[in-house]
Curated annotation (Swiss-Prot):
Binding of a divalent metal cation, residues: 9, 11, 43
EC numbers: 4.6.1.12
NCBIfam families linked to this entry: ispF
Residues at which 4-CDP-2-C-methyl-D-erythritol 2-phosphate binds: 9-11, 35-36, 57-59, 62-66, 133-136, 140, 143
Species per Swiss-Prot/TrEMBL record: Methylococcus capsulatus (strain ATCC 33009 / NCIMB 11132 / Bath)
Listed InterPro entries: MECDP_synthase, MECDP_synthase_CS, MECDP_synthase_sf
Taxon lineage: Bacteria, Pseudomonadati, Pseudomonadota, Gammaproteobacteria, Methylococcales
Gene Ontology process terms (BP): isopentenyl diphosphate biosynthetic process, methylerythritol 4-phosphate pathway; terpenoid biosynthetic process
Entry keyword Lyase: yes
Cofactor note (record): Binds 1 divalent metal cation per subunit.
Described purpose of this protein according to its UniProt entry: Involved in the biosynthesis of isopentenyl diphosphate (IPP) and dimethylallyl diphosphate (DMAPP), two major building blocks of isoprenoid compounds. Catalyzes the conversion of 4-diphosphocytidyl-2-C-methyl-D-erythritol 2-phosphate (CDP-ME2P) to 2-C-methyl-D-erythritol 2,4-cyclodiphosphate (ME-CPP) with a corresponding release of cytidine 5-monophosphate (CMP).
Site entry: Transition state stabilizer: 35, 134
Name of the protein in its database record: 2-C-methyl-D-erythritol 2,4-cyclodiphosphate synthase
Length: 158
């Protein structure tokens, strides 16, 4: 049996000197306003995985009202989601993440992002895709107010 999930997340910018996407620290003139590290790509992916397993969303499992998750590395959350899915008898088949950002340019970081996801999900790198796009100046991403991400995940019964 196969199950498909879709996820989305967005964070606005705040003062800072870097952002984190798929666990990769990227130098930038701003940071994310968030309870955790603000990794929108991993948050969208967690939602896609949880959705595929009919387990709700990231906020249900890791609420921003819980001090344990203040500033947490979102890779920790992703690994926990993978473990919860595995406990239900599912493996991750493949994932596809799209980051929507006017800036910074992400091409130089995509391979490291893919490697992090493959490692954390315990799947081959050729089962992981990460891509970036802009909105050509439209919307909150285009105005430089923040970044969003979309993710799709396929689960297979072991």
């Amino acid at each position: 049996m196969f199950r498909i999930g879709q996820g989305y997340d967005a964070h606005r910018f705040k003062e800072g000197d870097h952002i984190v996407l798929c666990g990769v620290k990227i130098p930038f003139g701003r940071g994310f306003a968030a309870h955790s590290d603000g990794d929108v790509a991993l948050h969208a992916l967690c939602d896609a995985l949880l959705g595929a397993a009919a387990l709700g969303d990231i906020g249900r499992h890791f609420p921003d009202t819980d001090a344990r998750y203040k500033g947490i590395d979102s890779r920790v959350l992703l690994r926990e989601v993978r473990q919860r899915i595995a406990s239900l008898g599912y493996t991750v088949g493949n994932v596809d993440v799209t980051v929507v950002a006017q800036a910074p340019r992400l091409a130089a970081h995509i391979q490291a992002m893919r490697e992090n996801l493959a490692q954390d999900l315990e799947i081959p790198p050729d089962c992981v895709n990460v891509k970036a796009t802009t909105t050509e100046g439209m919307g909150f991403e285009g105005r430089g107010e923040g970044i969003s991400a979309h993710a799709v995940a396929l689960l297979a019964r072991r």
